[in-house]
Amino acid sequence: MSFGGEGGREFMLDGKPFQIRSAEIHPQRVPRAYWRHRIQTAKAMGLNTIAFYVFWNQLEQPDGSWDFSGRNDIAAFIDLCQEEGMWVLFRPGPYVCGEWDLGGLPTYLIKDDVTPLRYTGNQQFMEAQTRYLEKMAEIAIPRLSRNGGPILMVQLENEYGSYKSPHDEMAYIEWLKDFWTKKGAGPFYLSEGS
């Protein structure tokens, strides 16, 4: 996936213009037995891509362990999209909104600390976020389109422009971009409120 065409404003896939027609299906909200049907239904509607959020607070358990079973098996969902001939827009957050408790962030991040989240000056948040994103990278990197997988792009953050941090820092977005770039991901996108 790259940008090109007239004025460099078209999505290009394998050197040809490509229009992303996407459905939003969050596997953590859908019983696993229905995943394939939902993906097939999106494809039958003429769509070619599945976008989905990952809810961090469903994966990281209160004891610090990680649960990638059942609806949380993000890798299996991506692989199923590929089996069904669909591309993927990977939206791991860490904040996803999605009308989900704390936007998918684990509640331990706000238990004792009043320092803003989504801020590079919050060491607890940055360390926890790094642990989470390492898990996401293990899943995503081998499944990027450049590696033969279905993931076209990685969303760096969700609705960050709508988030009014007292620090109003772009360093946070740059940190996310650097993290994913060092892992070999790209291109990236942001999604802002309309």
Task: Write out the residue ranges for each language-model feature.
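Active-site-adjacent "subsite" loops/lids of carbohydrate-active enzymes
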Residues: 96-138
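N-terminal carbohydrate-binding accessory modules
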Residues: 1-49, 79, 83
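Aromatic-lined substrate-binding rim segments of carbohydrate-active enzymes
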Residues: 35-103, 107-109, 176-186
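Hydrophobic faces of well-ordered beta-strands that scaffold small-molecule active sites
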Residues: 19-23, 48-52, 88-92, 152-156, ...
